[in-house]
Amino acid sequence: QRGVKFPCDALFRDGRLIAWLCPCREQANLLVRDGFEEYTPLALWKDYAARPLYGVSMLGTFHMPMRDGVELAADVYLPEGAPLPVPALLVRTPYDKDDGAQTYFRYVRRGYAVVVQDVRGRNESGGEWLPHYYEVEDGDDTLTWVGTQEWCDGSVGMLGGSYLGYTQWCAAALGNPHLKAMISVVTAGTAFADGPLHGGCFSSGGFAWNFAMTKRRFAPERMDRADWDEILDIRPLEDIGQKALGEDVPFIRKMLAHPCEDSFW
């Protein structure tokens, strides 16, 4: 229901609607009648909104080396005309860095560098795709790379929802000094308890997402099936990829091999 049932705030004065606010992940839609701005969050952002806007310049695609030698691809965007160095915002995604990157241009226009990275094994990044497994070390290494670039002032924030929110908590786990802020939305707590397994039981609801993540690029069409009841009856679960997709899915097998909260998680 995420596309149709966002919460809304309505503000009335003398029985008349004067403002309406609908928050949606990292953005919000606000409509307000002229003259009533002081009753809304706009009053808090008045000075910020008056600051100059910059153009968006793509510095390039960079392949960042991780501690084990694997390189992860990231696109870097800089505020055109802004005095460097500037603080940076980092987004780590399994859904292809070049898909929807324009969403983050509003931050570039406000004077931030933005770095959008494919996590390990996804899209243009090297290495093995194993959900959740590498995000702590990779996140820490990425923060260090971003924070030490000549265009960055050493301060890095992170943002994003769902898996993009999970990568933030992982990146924060080792206490990287460059990480100064996080906006983590609709995300999980731990990989074991809130991800593939819930209370020790493998979550059947996660198979649709797993199917969409079997290729190097996100393939949401693989979730759109009419035979999910039959698929979820397949036993053993390790065979679900071969029988439902006609191919083995190694990361599903690896997760199923660890039904307890051991060092894998």
What are these regions (language model features)?
Residues R109, A173-W265:
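Accessory cap/linker subdomain of secreted extracellular hydrolases
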Residues E80, Y95, A113, D118-R122, ...:
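Short beta-to-alpha linker loops that shape the active-site pocket of alpha/beta-hydrolase fold enzymes
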Residues Q1-A50:
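Acidic, serine/threonine-rich low-complexity disordered tracts
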Residues L130-E150:
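Alpha/beta-hydrolase active-site loop
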Residues E150-Y163:
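Alpha/beta-hydrolase fold nucleophile elbow
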Residues T93, D99-Q117:
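Short amphipathic alpha-helix adjacent to the substrate-entry channel of hydrolases
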Residues L44-L84:
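N-terminal cap/lid segment of alpha/beta-hydrolase-fold proteins
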Residues G121-P131:
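Glycine-rich "HGGG/HGxG" loop immediately N-terminal to the catalytic nucleophile
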